[in-house]
Amino acid sequence: IYLLADVGSIGGGWLSSRLIARGLSVNAGRKIAMLVCALCVTPVSLAVFADDLLVAVGIIGLAAAAHQGWSANLFTLASDVMPRRAVASLVGIGGMAGAVGGMLMAKYVGAALEGVGSYTPIFVGIGSVYLVALLISHLLSPQLEPARLPA
């Protein structure tokens, strides 16, 4: 699974760079790459129904690769839209939010598993959250225009 995640991280960055090099805008290149990654995560919803361990591992591996490709593009969005002096702060705030989200997710997963007795709602949620996040990202910044911060 971790090797697939490594490939996904490199592949996600490669895909957006390739799309931009072929003439797409940075906005289109990043968002198309993120859409591809989001779509590759969606099958993880089916992992809980896999009868074969290797099939489940393959589905989860694909999702891990797609997550890393998504992350590569998400972190690059910061440098696409923010001035150089603000990138580290933005990424740091995002990292903090991710850490808090991870803590909350651990609590939610435990509660869901205890209440429902199954990982199904967690995997279904994971399978859809990337598409929702991409939609929110697009609604917040449809053109990925550079932010203008006061000096």
Question: Model segments located where?
Answer:
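Transmembrane alpha-helical cores of Major Facilitator Superfamily
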Residues: 3, 61, 65, 92-100, ...
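Transmembrane alpha-helices of Major Facilitator/SLC transporters
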Residues: 1-20
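C-terminal transmembrane helical hairpin of 12-TM major facilitator-type secondary transporters
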Residues: 27-74
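Interfacial helix-cap and linker-helix signal at transmembrane-aqueous boundaries
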Residues: 15-16, 20, 108-117
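Discrete transmembrane alpha-helix packing/kink hotspots characteristic
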Residues: 8, 12, 101-105, 136
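Loop-to-transmembrane helix entry/capping segments in MFS-fold secondary transporters
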Residues: 84-93
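Intracellular helix-loop hinge segments at the cytoplasmic ends of transmembrane helices
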Residues: 73-81
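Multi-pass alpha-helical transporter architecture, strongest
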Residues: 42-50, 124-151
